[in-house]
């Protein structure tokens, strides 16, 4: 039995999809415990590139059962568009299952998201505008609509009307928008009920029974540690808990059953949207990482902000998630750049901080303290073992490992599934 949770250790886009794709073919279930169609990931299988948003990367596994857990918020239109797109390319999404307790994104959530961001102006968070935050807000406020609700029309209508009693007041009187018609929302949800019904399960029961039978479960977290609503760079965060603890809550798998916590981390750092970013680059090297690393958001099309590796954040992520292992990605992007700076600590108003500053204000004023290491010039994309890497690349990896709080068990040297060096097999260890 193994229950492995995959967590982004930075601000997202670390390569969680690749890690899930590799491990997903070796497990029985792949569950997405949080997020929605606001965070995309790219998976390369057999030379084919798949860009997924709502579905877990495990949907491309030929053997694993992919599950959207209770912590996910689901846009049904986006869900079936993604399924249809995969099947049009020959992929089989028929094994997908969905928790009856997952919440649904309503059209009015997307409207609220966009008008709120517009109202905030320069203070906007930089959301994707897909209604994720408002859906989670309704969940916490106990006025959300769950998957199970669309199979009972009377309950569905009651919940939609109740939600719109308040939201229409806000839209009309505060934002000068038209009121949303409740019946249109009800019919929108009902139109998906028949297609959705065969997919819906008691995910908590299924997953725990699988573990009791000695099967393997992979929890594929969305977003990343530094976007966690509690542990991230608040308020520039997502609306869920994309950390190891959140994976337990969003899947219904108890924390004592989690056997490994695998952090996914780039050999440099990126971020999309607003918020502090101590190692951010504004020179030619930022543009270099952006171009060579292909740093454009799958979901938004926005260019990612790029910076050097930040070991302060890595140590913080290790602590918050209890990482047992790291999966280092995009090492190949650093080939041939001369010298590689590594952030080992921060300077905040003349005081050295080896760990995350206590307050958000201090973090905003943090200046990175760097040490540098020489880069390598050799092409590493065909390396199969750690010993195949140039010595300078080995030294860089080992230094990051020393600084980051957990052992490095996987190293990505290219986008392909087979372009991965395995130092420790987390499944074999469990």
From Swiss-Prot:
Identify the catalytic residues: 13 (proton acceptor), 41 (proton donor)
Which leading EC class covers this enzyme? Answer: ligase
Highest taxon above the source species: Bacteria
Q: Which reaction does it catalyse?
A: IMP + L-aspartate + GTP = N(6)-(1,2-dicarboxyethyl)-AMP + GDP + phosphate + 2 H(+)
**Which cofactor(s) are needed, names only?**
Mg(2+)
Binding locations of GTP: 12-18, 40-42, 304, 330-332, 412-414
Name its cellular compartments: Cytoplasm
Query: Can you name this protein?
Result: Adenylosuccinate synthetase
Upper lineage is: Bacteria, Bacillati, Actinomycetota, Actinomycetes, Mycobacteriales
């Amino acid at each position: 039995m193994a229950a492995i949770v995959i967590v982004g250790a930075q601000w997202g886009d670390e390569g969680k999809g690749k890690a899930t794709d590799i491990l997903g073919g070796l497990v029985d279930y792949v569950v997405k415990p949080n997020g929605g169609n606001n965070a995309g990931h790219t998976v390369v299988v057999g030379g084919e590139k798949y860009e997924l948003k709502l579905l877990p990367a495990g949907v491309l596994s030929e053997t694993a059962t992919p599950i959207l857990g209770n912590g996910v918020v689901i846009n049904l239109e986006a869900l079936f568009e993604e399924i249809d797109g995969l099947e049009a390319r020959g992929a089989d999404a028929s094994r997908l299952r969905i928790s009856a307790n997952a919440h649904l994104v309503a059209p009015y959530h997307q409207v609220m998201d966009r008008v709120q961001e517009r109202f905030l102006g320069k203070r906007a968070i930089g959301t994707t505008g897909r209604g994720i935050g408002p859906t989670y807000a309704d969940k916490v406020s106990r006025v959300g609509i769950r998957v199970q609700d669309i199979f009972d029309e009377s309950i569905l209508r009651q919940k939609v009307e109740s939600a719109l009693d308040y939201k229409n007041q806000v839209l009309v009187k505060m934002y000068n928008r038209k009121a949303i018609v409740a019946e249109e929302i009800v019919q929108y949800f009902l139109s998906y009920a028949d297609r959705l019904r065969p997919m819906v399960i008691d995910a908590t029961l299924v997953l725990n029974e699988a573990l009791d039978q000695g099967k393997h479960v992979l929890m594929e977290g969305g977003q990343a540690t530094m976007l966690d609503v509690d542990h991230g760079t608040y308020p520039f965060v997502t609306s869920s808990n994309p950390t190891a603890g959140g994976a337990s809550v969003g899947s219904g798998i108890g924390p004592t059953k989690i056997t490994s916590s695998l952090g996914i981390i780039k050999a440099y750092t990126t971020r999309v949207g607003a918020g502090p970013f101590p190692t951010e680059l504004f020179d030619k090297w930022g543009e270099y990482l952006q171009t060579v690393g292909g740093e454009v958001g799958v979901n938004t099309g926005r260019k990612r902000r790029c910076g050097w590796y930040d070991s302060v954040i890595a140590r913080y992520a290790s602590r918050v998630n209890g990482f047992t292992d790291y999966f280092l990605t995009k090492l190949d992007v650093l080939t041939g750049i001369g010298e590689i700076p590594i952030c080992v600590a921060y300077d905040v108003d003349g005081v050295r901080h080896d760990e995350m500053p206590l307050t958000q204000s201090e973090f905003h004023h943090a200046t990175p303290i760097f040490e540098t290491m020489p880069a390598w010039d050799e092409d590493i994309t065909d390396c199969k073992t750690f010993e195949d890497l140039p010595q300078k690349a080995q030294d860089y990896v080992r230094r990051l490992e020393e600084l980051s709080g957990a052992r490095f068990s996987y190293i990505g040297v290219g986008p392909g599934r087979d372009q991965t060096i395995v130092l420790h097999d987390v499944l074999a260890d469990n």
